Amino acid sequence: MSKKKLQTIQAPKGVPDYIPPVSPEFLGVRDTFAHQAHLAGYEHIELPIFEDTTLFARGVGESTDVVTKEMYTFADRGDRSVTLRPEGTAGVMRAVIEHNLDRGQLPVKLNYYGPFFRYERPQAGRYRQLQQVGVEAIGVDDPALDAEVIALADRSLKVIGLTGYRLELTSLGDHTCRPQYREKLQEFLFKLPLDEETRHRAEINPLRVLDDKRPEIQEMTVDAPLMLDNLSDSSREHFELVTGMLDDLNVAYVVNPRMVRGLDYYTKTTFEFVHDGLGAQSGIGGGGRYDGLMAQLGGQELSGIGYALGVDRCLLALEAEQKRVTDGSRVNVFGVAMGSAAKREMVRIIDALRSAGISADMAYGDRGLKGAMKGADRAGARFALVLGDRELENNCVAVKDLAQQGQRDVSLDNLILEIQSAL
């Protein structure tokens, strides 16, 4: 009686795998973003994958779609409510408060990367497990810091080769002008024939209504009062200083007075990077200033500013522009051994190359020379090392330059130096 074959298991819906040849591009984008942050003085912070649910309910905003519809929340075995992190800023702020990082040199400048989780309808560029790289600068309310953060995000996108995006920004005001604007906006919204759920949202946070993507709501709110027209003098001055410094840095931008970010903690400067090559899911990253978030989470009255760039979205944007970026992790040397004695020696050679910092791999199994050389091509190797009885007798190896189609014998004693000088 034949044994029944077990059913295969697939990844959960909306959770992508990044496998070769895409994984080097994924790492290239992620690591480039992280490196640019490091160049600007942002130190790495590693955050928990899940947190106490209260952190996001209080920090992100109870009226946001993220909290009400998109979070992966569950009770652990101790019956504590925990949530897979939907974004990074709240977790960074929690860590800063918990470990007293705000008691030292300010601003605290941190960067992070990793997976985040939102229950959304999966489509191109929108996944339930999304990959982001972000920075946070905490503790100083300075327009120059806003300009630095925005310019850093802009530079990061340029370094990976993106050109077909635009930067949109606005100001969401501060505690002195937002209450009056809130009343004015609610007065406008309550005159509209809103459905019950939208009216409830207008009561809790009317800005959320302006963020509604339904065409009928967008049409009804086209004449809604705008925050940018109701800024306090200090908020207006702050925004003008930020845009002036962006001009000095040659960072191109478009002021979008109708912009509303999907998280409640943003104040003053708010921005988003948009790429029209992605269709409906055009945002590739964004961020802004958050003046009250730390106090809201039980810490000091300190402000901060940050951004998150979507690695998944940026990969799609690169594809739309027919560009590629890699992490440089290709195999430089691929070994091909002909015979058991040669294979034993090749194992030693490959290990010595790796110890010298040269990426190297070799053919395994009993493939012939032709099949093994195909492996070198698939690996993207610059050099192939061929070792057989002749080479063993002469204490050398045949080095094939796969880029320039040349071949020569190199002494085993000089091999590492020869490869290092050629790379």
From Swiss-Prot:
Record's subcellular location: Cytoplasm
Catalysed reactions listed for this entry: tRNA(His) + L-histidine + ATP = L-histidyl-tRNA(His) + AMP + diphosphate + H(+)
Enzyme Commission code: 6.1.1.21
One MF term in the entry's GO annotations: histidine-tRNA ligase activity
GO biological process terms, semicolon-separated: histidyl-tRNA aminoacylation
Gene Ontology cellular component terms for the protein in this record: cytoplasm
Disulfide bond residue pairs: none
Presence of keyword Chloroplast: no
UniProtKB keywords: Aminoacyl-tRNA synthetase, ATP-binding, Cytoplasm, Ligase, Nucleotide-binding, Protein biosynthesis
Keyword Lipid metabolism recorded: no
Chief location bin: cytoplasm
InterPro entries reported in the protein's UniProt record: aa-tRNA-synth_II, aa-tRNA-synth_II/BPL/LPL, Anticodon-bd, Anticodon-bd_dom_sf, His-tRNA-ligase, HisRS-like_core, HisRS/HisZ, HisRS_anticodon
UniProt subunit comment: Homodimer.
NCBIfam families to which the protein is assigned, alphabetical: hisS
Family: Belongs to the class-II aminoacyl-tRNA synthetase family.
Record-given protein name: Histidine--tRNA ligase
Protein source organism: Corynebacterium diphtheriae (strain ATCC 700971 / NCTC 13129 / Biotype gravis)
